[in-house]
């Protein structure tokens, strides 16, 4: 029997270290970043998992608050009985009641392209998880990481740059871009050290 994140501070800390390292590396990168998953909400309070494919834009709220993402994951695990890997990857988002979006889509672009959407993947969840079912810390985080004009169930593609004032993107190079979307890039942090080791 696996111990839940909510009952295992050591496992929570390992997940936090891993996610912090990945988000910082992505935000600091000027080439391909690590492939990461992050979670957001929509206007209906439903959740979606976004997979960066090493290139997709991420709201600064996510890169600046890895602990907030971990709090969401702890609540999702508690509600859905889903065990997150130490790296935080989420296979088959519908299993946790979330929609799935991937920056690569059917064809990986090979580089960051401003305005390129994340594409919906997989099956929609049979029973979408709602922000209202999460604890107050997770709900507050997801109110900030929200696409307030979109419904994930109605969306086939989502452009992160259209919904957030400030983003991180893992590259300084792009072509065929929408130049108006290049201005909200947050300052790059210092790159992290070595990747944290999993103690699982």
Question: What residue spans do the PLM features occupy?
Answer:
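Short N-terminal edge-element motif at the start of the domain
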Residues: 2-61, 66
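Low-complexity intrinsically disordered segments
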Residues: 66-200
């Amino acid at each position: 029997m696996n111990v839940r994140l909510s009952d295992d501070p050591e496992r929570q800390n390992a997940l936090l270290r891993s996610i912090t390292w990945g988000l910082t590396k992505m935000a600091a990168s000027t080439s391909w970043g690590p492939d990461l998953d992050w979670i957001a909400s929509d206007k209906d309070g439903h959740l979606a998992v976004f997979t960066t494919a090493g290139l997709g834009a991420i709201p600064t709220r996510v890169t600046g608050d890895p602990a907030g993402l971990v709090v969401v994951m702890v609540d999702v695990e508690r509600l859905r009985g889903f065990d997150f890997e130490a790296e935080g990857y989420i296979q088959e988002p519908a299993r946790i009641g979330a929609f799935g979006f991937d920056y690569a889509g059917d064809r990986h672009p090979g580089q960051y392209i401003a305005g390129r959407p994340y594409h919906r993947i997989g099956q929609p969840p049979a029973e979408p998880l709602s922000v209202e079912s999460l604890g107050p810390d997770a709900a507050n985080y997801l109110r900030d990481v929200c696409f307030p004009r979109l419904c994930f169930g109605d969306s086939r593609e989502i452009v992160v740059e259209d919904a957030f004032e400030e983003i991180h993107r893992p590259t300084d190079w792009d072509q065929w871009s929408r130049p108006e979307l290049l201005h909200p890039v947050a300052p790059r942090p210092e790159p992290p050290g070595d990747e944290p080791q999993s103690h699982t």
